[in-house]
Amino acid sequence: MIVGLGTDLVEIARMERLLARHGDRALTRLLHVQERAECPRAPDRAARFLARRFAAKEAAAKALGTGIANGIRFADLQVSHDDRGRPLLNLHGEARQHAQALGATGHHLSISDEQTHALAFVVLESSD
């Protein structure tokens, strides 16, 4: 059964501006420590990377029904990939606790990007 659903669309140029203005401070606030280690250093590639992650985290926060609030931080929502490149969502801290309170036993993440935008879709499901 679906217990949460979220989607988000991010303009990549917005992330370019954010990085130009705030640099590493933005990465520290928005990314999990492992994501920061994976983030490319080239500005255009970093903005695309950040846009995909930001869209995924916003979609996850919407699926949780909280947004980025109530103790849930961007760094609590980590995006990684399996060996085949499938995106994975890892929940930490308050995000994990909130998902458990919803009865979520699994989650699915889809991410896509084109020249100007990144899009993410998250489904939280329970075994009931």
Curated annotation (Swiss-Prot):
As for what it does, the entry says: Transfers the 4'-phosphopantetheine moiety from coenzyme A to a Ser of acyl-carrier-protein.
Species of provenance? Alkalilimnicola ehrlichii (strain ATCC BAA-1101 / DSM 17681 / MLHE-1)
Q: Which InterPro entries match?
A: 4-PPantetheinyl_Trfase_dom (IPR008278), 4-PPantetheinyl_Trfase_dom_sf (IPR037143), ACPS (IPR002582), Ppantetheine-prot_Trfase_dom (IPR004568)
Q: What family does this chain come from, according to its entry?
A: Belongs to the P-Pant transferase superfamily. AcpS family.
For this protein, the record's Gene3D superfamilies field holds: 4'-phosphopantetheinyl transferase domain (3.90.470.20)
GO terms of molecular function: holo-[acyl-carrier-protein] synthase activity; magnesium ion binding
Residues annotated to bind Mg(2+)? D8, E58
> What GO CC terms are in its UniProt record?
cytoplasm
List the EC numbers from the record: 2.7.8.7
Keyword annotations of the record: Cytoplasm, Fatty acid biosynthesis, Fatty acid metabolism, Lipid biosynthesis, Lipid metabolism, Magnesium, Metal-binding, Transferase
| Catalytic reactions on record | apo-[ACP] + CoA = holo-[ACP] + adenosine 3',5'-bisphosphate + H(+)
Q: Which cofactor does it need?
A: Mg(2+)
Localization, per the record, is: Cytoplasm
What is the protein's given name? Holo-[acyl-carrier-protein] synthase
Q: Which GO terms describe its biological process?
A: fatty acid biosynthetic process
Ribosomal protein recorded as keyword: no
